[in-house]
């Protein structure tokens, strides 16, 4: 219906997000020129996605739809490489096409593929180097490079962690050896962690706060 309305009024839907049942209308999406941004394997967690399947991304891609893998979760958003790999497991997608769903394809959806999404001369020098195949759960980030500058180096990070641990041990030892009683401490009050997701406003009202 959305695509019919768009065509009636002379515009095109660029991307359908959270389209967990997109496989049902993938041919129509291709005809319309719409792309898809979907979760990898979420299904049946609410009525609207009762018929979602983990083959969704692959089936849409097979119809020629440009597909990206997304997440609105703070934790899962850090592991989209592993989320993309699920389409290899479930749908038999090639590794190259799976990687595109979290690199080049999202850039295409945002119309930024002229400067990001792939390693090519003239594009932004934003690169992540892994210890293994980035689609493997064993892979660890070795380097993160933004605009050609190394912002994360795993070996240096280990050295920093060791230095911080030694400093922590030194401070604790000094505290234990001190004869001073010090002032009365303030009771520790744990602040709830704020966690935002796509349904936060609907669940928590206008404040947009959701605590766990």
Could you describe each region identified by the protein language model?
Residues 1, 19-26, 76-77:
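Active-site environment of divalent metal-dependent phosphoester hydrolases
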Residues 1, 5-9:
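Conserved, well-ordered alpha-helix/loop/beta-strand core segments that scaffold catalytic motifs
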Residues 9-10, 92:
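Short helix-capping segments at alpha-helix termini
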Residues 12-21, 41-46:
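Catalytic beta/alpha-barrel core
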Residues 27-30, 34-130, 139:
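His/Asp/Glu-enriched, well-ordered alpha-helical/loop segment
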Residues 120-164:
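C-terminal cap of metal-dependent C-N hydrolases
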Residues 134, 172-212:
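C-terminal recognition in membrane/secretory proteostasis and scaffolding
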Residues 153-185:
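Pro/Ala/Gly-rich low-complexity, hydrophilic intrinsically disordered segments
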